[in-house]
Amino acid sequence: MGLFKVIFTAVAALSAVDAAELLSSAKSKDIIPNSYLVVMKDSVSSAELDSHVSWVTDLHREGVAKRGAENLGGFKHSYKINGWHAYSGSFDSETLASILDNDKVDFVEHDRHVYISGFVTQKDAPSWGLGRVSHRMNGTRDYVYDESAGSGITFYGVDTGIDIHHPDFGGRAVWGINVVNDTKDNDRHGHGTHTAATAAGTKYGLAKKANVVAVKALNDYGAGLWSNIMKALEWCVNDAREKKILGKAVLNLSISGGKVVAANQAITNAAKAGIFVSVAAGNDNQDATNKSPASAENVCCAAATTIRDDKAKFSNYGSVVKLYAPGQGITSATPNNQTGVMSGTSMAAPHVGGVGATLMASKGIAPAAVCAELIKMASGPVLNPGANTTNKLLYNRSGK
């Protein structure tokens, strides 16, 4: 009997050690109660994920019957991105405990809110970003660029939606998907249209011939859930694969929130699938190391400069920043055939995405190599870039 107790205790201890971890989060205000992102181990196959999801669905159903957890929706969505597997759902504590104890699960994380990284400053002010990224020296508004202008490249704007009928897109924009419940297939906020036109507008954009796909993952107030962002990423990868444009696609994330490991992994795997991903550093004037998507691997993280080539006072900084780009007082298209001026690292990121698209079109550079090439091409120095931060400024190597 004593031997049995010893063995039982050892097995129980081993089970506890092997249990998946529920990652803690420093900022509780962004957490969605009882909503989780569940990431599977690398060895788990697509079929095994499907089987696991069936088990979780049954487990949740039993929990509702026993404990009356009707207010929790259970399983929501599974993610399959370039061999990476995860799912989201709302579960009670007992169901969560069973999930954590499942040997297929790597870790679990709270789903959290995420927000745009830009804000409106004024309407119809003069633009300067295009001229700045096409000249080594400051002081000119002429935009000089390779004639390919992103031709053959597709830009996915994962944002508040895009006004695809805006004349600045010249008929090159199409609607992709809306993953936000209770919203229409349009851009009532303006942020998504502005960032997409900064990257690929005919007048206001850098990659003037690129195709544009609207992917609505944020609501009409510029806020969203990481679980929806991940769903949008999965759709983009699948869409690019179906259209055979992996290797010729750019995806922009002008959003920021607290660091979410599951989201970072989803973004990284989207990049590894064959998409150049430009992201915003965030607007908190702090180190972006603890921010997502800025801290994700295999992305090109952009911080924001002013017209004077200094760090914008709101811009985040830190070692994860790959480049600075224009981000204060940027004029671009807004819904209903309008234009407007916005500021933020949200505006810096599509500058990087747009120049990246032109580089891919003109030089045939693979998405995985684009950020390193942009760093090599960069000008500067940016003034007062922040601690442990590059002083390199985005430049398209126009020769000017």
From Swiss-Prot:
Signal peptide: 1-19
UniProt GO MF annotations: serine-type endopeptidase activity
Primary enzyme class: hydrolase
Domain Inhibitor I9 residues, every copy: 35-116
The species this protein was found in: Trichophyton verrucosum (strain HKI 0517)
Function comment: Secreted subtilisin-like serine protease with keratinolytic activity that contributes to pathogenicity.
Keywords recorded for this protein, A-Z: Glycoprotein, Hydrolase, Protease, Secreted, Serine protease, Signal, Virulence, Zymogen
Sequence similarity: Belongs to the peptidase S8 family.
Residues making up the propeptide: 20-117
InterPro entries, per the entry: PCSK9_ProteinaseK-like, Peptidase_S8/S53_dom, Peptidase_S8/S53_dom_sf, Peptidase_S8_subtilisin-like, Peptidase_S8_subtilisin-rel, S8pro/Inhibitor_I9, S8pro/Inhibitor_I9_sf
Protein name: Subtilisin-like protease 11
Originating gene: SUB11
Biological process terms in GO annotation: proteolysis
Residue positions the entry lists as glycosylated: 138, 181, 252, 337, 388, 396
Source organism, top-level taxon: Eukaryota
Subcellular location: Secreted
PANTHER family: CEREVISIN-RELATED, PEPTIDASE S8
